Every structure is written in structure tokens, then in C-alpha cells.
Amino acid sequence: MAGQSSRFPNTRPKWMLTHPSTNRFMVTESILGLNLDFFDQIYFVCLQDHQDKYMFLDGFLRELEDVGLYEKSKVAFLPEKTRSQSETVYQLIKSENIEGFIFIKDSDGFFKCNLDDTKNQVAYFDLNDLDNINARTKSYLQLDVNNVVTNIVEKRVISSTFCVGGYGFEDALEFCDTYEKFKDLSQECYVSHIIFEMMLFGSSFYGTKTTQFKDWGTLTEWNKFKREHKCLFVDIDGTIVTNSSIHFPPYVGTGEPLQGNIDFLNELRDSDKVAIVLTTSRPESMREATIREMKRIGMGFDSLIMGLPHCERIVINDFANSNPYPSCRAINLPRNSDKLREFFE
């Protein structure tokens, strides 16, 4: 969070970008795959310059309260950019007098794992379980039969297991002592350098297997992730059920389910990547009847907009680097056709 976000040009700092399904900050989502009850305190380390420019703090604290993390969270501000994640952690430990076990988590990725031990550890995932990944941007580790890390290397593929941006250190002070050996180096000091140095002097690190890894490390990867998520505005009459009317038969509530469309839309929604907003020109007075009808035919949805004018509908949405063009599109489906799947790209 205190880095340069150089791989996210012309956007807010990457950790402030909005998650496409929850509308939370990227950084908030990045930690929700961990069993956070394991920790007594959660520190978010930011630049004072980011607060001065974006005034994010009040909104961030409200968000932390919404997800139940406010009481154990602290936002720490640094006066200037650090040269590495290691330096950021070092400065935090020193300024907050942190002792004992620490777990360092990248803000630009997500994974699930259960932490139940305060030993030295490295969270990892396997290349064979991913379809697409920029392998050259990762650090890699080798494990022996006892799950002990025997080697860790930055930006070079030495095995199929790579670090996912989660590192546990049994002793925060040992981390600092090791970092001080590197702090005057001209190049960036990666956390993997700290780990390798500690291993050379006798410390053991263990692998912590993770699931559901999501890589948000570059703007390209983030936008690719965002494109997997959709918000569909779906008209009811003629799309979900055969066209019905409040004025003449077939009356509202008597339309036949367009089962092919219903099944397809429910599949999308069940992926947890698609939100469905049903729209209709039916009057607000028919909301409860419409909800009962959707329940009866098994159509899942997230929101329902009633009372729209019966005319051409146009979606207007902004686009930007963080929400690239095209940020919206439309599908014109023949009335009462149940072939929506064929029109959906």
C-alpha cells in the first residue's frame, strides 16, 4: 500500500481500486480469504500523500466497520514512499513496537488459507492449478517431503509452486535484524531475500498451501479479473416469461416461463460473478406479485426495478483506465425467444 503502483498507470493507487462484485477497496477484499480471527491486530500501511490527495480514510474506516474489522484495524501513515515491501514492514514494526508473530499480506491478490500456527511460513499456490499467469513476476519456492522450504528465488521459475504474497515470521524482531543487512542495497529488497537469508542462518520456513488464488498484480490482470464480472439488467416480459400485460390477455402473472433463458441466467448468477437486476414497465403496485411470480418460476435475482417507461432503453456508463471501454453493452433479443445463451458473448 505504500509502494508506487507503477504497473497501474493513470489510476488511483491500486489498493484503492473498486472490487467488481463487492464494491469494496481491493485491499479489503485481499485479506478476506484469511481467518482474520487468528490475528490480534491488522495494520494497513499507507502513504500520507495518498490521504492528502484522495481523502480516503473516512470511507476506508467505514468499510472496515462494515466487514467487522474496525476494532482490530489500524491505518499507519508513512511520510514518503518506501523502496520495497520489506522496508515498509520494517518501518511499521519499528514505529509500532511490534513483537512476536507477523504475517505480511500483499494488497494486490486474493487467496484462501487457514492460519493456525505462528511458525515461519510462506503461502504458496501451484502453477498447474492456474490457466493463465505471468510466471516471470512471481517468486518460487521448493519444498521437501516434510513441507519445509529448501529454496526460495525471486523472478525465476525453479518449481511449480510460487509465492502468493503471504509470509509469516515467528519473530518480528528477527525480521528487522535480517532486513538491516540489506537496507543499504541499491536494488529492491524483496521479502524472499529476507527469508533466504534467515534460512542460511538456520531458520526454518514451512509451506502453507492456499486455494482460490487471484492475481491482481498489474492493471491488465486486474481488468481481466473485472471482465469476468457482470451486472445484467434483464427485462421480465418477453425475456423471462412470455410477454404479458396489465391491459389485456395474457395478463401479468400468466406468462409462460422461458425456461432456456431462466436456466442460463441462473447459471451465470450461481457463478458468484454475475448480478441480475430485473427491470419491467409493470407498475410499482405489482412488485409483490412480480416477486412471487419470479419465485414460482425459479428465477433468481438481486434487484428489481419497477415502473420503467415502455420505450427504448439506453445504458449509459462511464469508462476509464480502471473501468476500460466498453464499460457497457446491450443485447436485443427477439420477443419471447428462449435463446438468450446464443446472443450472450
Q: Can you annotate each of these PLM segments?
A:
Residues 1-11, 226-227, 231-237:
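N-terminal nucleotide-binding beta1-loop-alpha1 segment
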Residues 7, 21-100:
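Conserved N-terminal catalytic core of the sugar/cofactor nucleotidyltransferase
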Residues 11-31, 253-261:
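Short catalytic helix/loop segments, enriched in acidic residues and glycine
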Residues 51, 108-112, 239:
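A short, conserved beta-strand element in the Rossmann-like catalytic core
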Residues 99-110:
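Short beta-strand-to-loop acidic/aromatic patch adjacent to the donor-nucleotide binding site
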Residues 110-185:
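Conserved core of the sugar-phosphate nucleotidyltransferase
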Residues 160-229:
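Conserved alpha/beta core of the MobA/IspD/sugar-nucleotide pyrophosphorylase nucleotidyltransferase superfamily
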Residues 229-345:
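HAD-like aspartate-dependent phosphatase fold
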